Amino acid sequence: NVVYEDHFFTVYKEIKRLRSLLPLYYFGTEIGVNAIVLKYRIPSSTHQVNKSIAPLQDAQQAIYLARTNASEWGIDKNKIGIMGFSAGGHLASTAATHYEDIKVTNPGNTSYRPNFQILIYPVISFSSYGHKGSRDNLIGPVINEDQVHYFSNEEHINKNAPPAFLVHAKDDGAVLVANSINYYKQLLENQVAAELYLFEKGGHGFGMKNNTSEVHWPQLMQQWMIKNNIINK
């Protein structure tokens, strides 16, 4: 499972973020999931020809490496999924919906389609209800309708989209819950296996445990993965 975290800006923040992911690693190990963390490039006009595709290039390269090295790494190449939190959720959902638009070299004609997607309070859309900060960071403050459409991932779901598990809080003031709801609606319309869990409260960035609820979403995720034959009981 490739985990797309948000960007790391300093050594301190990198260590802090990696530590914050440890419970996820431990839980994954318990249920039989190996995690690969992707530290992807921050979009930058100074040294990238097209900064908007740099993160997607890194995501696709991560999927390529995982799939082509699956035997050596002891993983199932047909059960390689993606997981993203917040802005990392936008990258994960971009990889899940644009896997046929390959932005990297593919000498072995490897499939870039993830086998499943797990999105936790994700940025999905660059439309009116999307997250302006994520949009500006990726494509800039000047509105380009073609790019807004391209990176509004709810608009690119089809019947071949990977099965999806989503979690969001209704009172999320940073990334509106409409991101997950509209993505889920499109998954349903295209008859893609999907499950959405909405917390009444919790805001944004609650991580592995929403302290406002007795429900723990990692256990829900585990049951969903079992139902979809991703992991064993």
Residue ranges: model-predicted function:
Residues 160, 165-168, 172:
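Short beta-strand/loop motif that positions the catalytic acidic residue
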Residues 181-233:
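C-terminal catalytic histidine-bearing segment of alpha/beta-hydrolase fold enzymes
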Residues 17-18, 24-25, 36-77, 210-216:
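Catalytic nucleophile-loop/oxyanion-hole region of alpha/beta-hydrolase
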Residues 1-27:
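Short, surface-exposed "cap/lid" segments of acyl-processing enzymes
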Residues 173-179:
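Conserved alpha/beta-hydrolase "acid-adjacent" motif
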Residues 122-156, 162, 189:
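Mobile cap/lid helix-loop segments that gate and shape the active-site cleft of serine hydrolases
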Residues 2, 61-131, 148-149:
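Primarily recognizes the serine-hydrolase "nucleophile elbow" in alpha/beta-hydrolase
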Residues 29-39, 81, 116, 195:
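A fold-wide structural signal in alpha/beta-hydrolase
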